[in-house]
Amino acid sequence: MANHKIAIIQFYPEPNEIESNHIRAVTFIREAAASGAQLAVLPEYHLADFVPSHDPAIRQQCANWKKYLDAYCALAKECNICVVPGSFAELHDDSTIVNATYFIDNNGVICGRYEKKNLWHPERPYVKGSKNDTRHTAFDTPLGKVGMVICWDLAFPEAFRELIIQGAKMIIVPAYWKYTDASEIGMKRNPKSEGVFLDAAVVSRAFENTCAVVFCNVAGPEKEGFAGLSQVALPFVGCIERFENSEEGMKIVDVDMNILEEAEGAYKIREDIATSDWHYGYNR
């Protein structure tokens, strides 16, 4: 398996500044391509900072999501780079909003789309989760078989299992995850508890699924609860690159995918799951 150069873009979405956020995101992607990255990943809700309490009018702005998706497709082709443009809050004709992410290949073609299943509690009054009868789906890309989940999905190992059963070797996680998500009670116990959660979960998912996990979180002022901590993890070696704070920036990570085969040879997790008498009953 090949090495891949992946750009994780820890990006601060200025509230309700969709157009200027897009312009800044494009600049980061161009820089990633110029640095030789094969894939650039942005965080969840990177265009709109979709927190309905900020401004109810943001709902109507979410109707323009297709314009920006098309722009990212054109940019990916122009720069010869694959792009996961974080996630979009998509307002559809039936007046529902969904939280969706895409994998765009270096020819500008959409290889895969995913709608967030496990909505974070404040999203639920405003955002529609994907249907219960839809599976997590892995898909082919220039970087191999890939799966995607969004933010709080990281807390559910079942999502990752469904993806590796289908052969995913890399799972990409755009996120909008803050220290304050721990609630007031959790923050009193440990103000950085969500950092402990993120570091543990990202590395655990990599080990327990013999896959690469690319976690890309939003940036923002720590005094407002932003955690950052975007990172990439592999089995055997754990976290191979990580933002140590919540500042905006980009890291180009060299990901040795050969480690996945070595780890599978040791742990045989995929081999066990593929047997006909696998005892946990995951969907095949």
Positions of predicted regions on the chain:
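Extreme N-terminal starter segment of soluble prokaryotic enzymes
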Residues: 2-8
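Short loop/turn motifs at secondary-structure junctions and domain boundaries
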Residues: 91-96, 221-225
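Short polar catalytic/cofactor-binding loops
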Residues: 10-16
